[in-house]
Curated annotation (Swiss-Prot):
BP GO annotations: border follicle cell migration; cell migration; enzyme-linked receptor protein signaling pathway; ephrin receptor signaling pathway; imaginal disc fusion, thorax closure; myoblast fusion; phagocytosis, engulfment; positive regulation of JNK cascade
Protein name per UniProt: Adapter molecule Crk
Name of the coding gene: Crk
Record organism: Drosophila melanogaster (Fruit fly)
Expression tissues: Embryonic zygotic expression is seen in invaginating presumptive mesoderm and ectodermally derived tissues during gastrulation. At stage 8, expression is also seen in anterior and posterior midgut and cephalic furrow. By stage 9, expression is highest in visceral mesoderm of anterior and posterior midgut, ventral nerve cord and somatic mesoderm.
Domain of life: Eukaryota
GO cellular component terms, A-Z: cytoplasm
Length: 271
């Protein structure tokens, strides 16, 4: 019988994932009992145990239930204190045609840093421009879980990375986002999770001027101190907003959100 470490959550928990994608991953496996756990798409907070059977993939809902003062995980008529105990139980008991044997193999996806990211939260994974990371999970649109070459795992902001392949070198790193002057194409990040998850519209102050390409009529011209009304934060790093009555896009590296109206300039415009 195959064995696996139930305490290694990253090996079996695939995070947000569609039923179709889970089926595709498991149907590429040849043996019964290969499985993964994903988030439920219909009930927030619940999970789905997806298992490769003989000729199909079965999906078993795992309900996260509050019982008195504790949380239990219920699958069918069985309840468990946590997910590792649930998985251990089904390595010894059949679900339909098979017990659990091992987690599904992940598609190895690598990314490379476009900027330095120093991180601001305990869960962040700092990295440098040009550093290669392996994606563990795509938790949110703008924040993913990744692992570095030392094996450390943490959260990274999607706008700071791009897809990587083994043939890339530093010259292939996207240079569409201008760097801070004098920093050798390295952007010292103070980006916070709240920046990318901020309720929009929100206001941001320009911290680096920018003169856009004359042929790009949708790009905003930025002057230090300008206040932009940010209307959209795209994962490619080109945000959208309104400045001086014009709507357009601008690189997120050139602005920082403001949290109050205590500004010597433009305060009457944004309060």
């Amino acid at each position: 019988m195959d064995t696996f470490d139930v305490s290694d959550r990253n090996s079996w928990y695939f995070g947000p994932m569609s039923r179709q994608d889970a089926t595709e991953v498991l149907m590429n496996e040849r043996e019964r009992g290969v499985f993964l756990v994903r988030d439920s798409n219909s009930i927030a907070g619940d999970y789905v145990l997806c298992v490769r059977e003989d000729t199909k993939v079965s999906n078993y809902i795992i309900n996260k239930v509050q019982q008195q003062d504790q949380i239990v995980y219920r699958i069918g008529d069985q309840s468990f204190d946590n997910l590792p105990k649930l998985l251990t139980f089904y390595t010894l008991h059949y679900l339909d045609t098979t017990p659990l044997k091992r987690p599904a193999c992940r598609r190895v996806e690598k990314v490379i840093g476009k900027f330095d990211f120093v991180g601001s939260d305990q869960d962040d994974l700092p990295f440098q421009r040009g550093e290669v990371l392996t994606i563990v999970r795509k938790d949110e649109d703008q924040w993913w879980t990744a692992r570095n070459s030392s094996g450390k795992i943490g959260q990274i902001p999607v706008p700071y990375i791009q897809q990587y392949d083994d043939y890339m070198d530093e010259d292939a790193i996207d240079k569409n986002e201008p760097s801070i002057s004098g920093s050798s194409n390295v952007f010292e990040s103070t980006l916070k999770r709240t920046d990318l998850n901020r309720k929009l519209p929100a206001y941001a102050r320009v911290k680096q001027s920018r003169v856009p390409n004359a042929y790009d009529k949708t790009a905003l011209k930025l002057e230090i101190g300008d206040i932009i009304k940010v209307t959209k934060t795209n994962i490619n790093g080109q945000w959208e907003g309104e400045l001086n009555g014009k709507n357009g896009h601008f690189p997120f590296t050139h602005v920082e959100f403001v949290d109050d109206c205590d500004l010597s300039k433009n305060s009457t415009e944004i309060c």
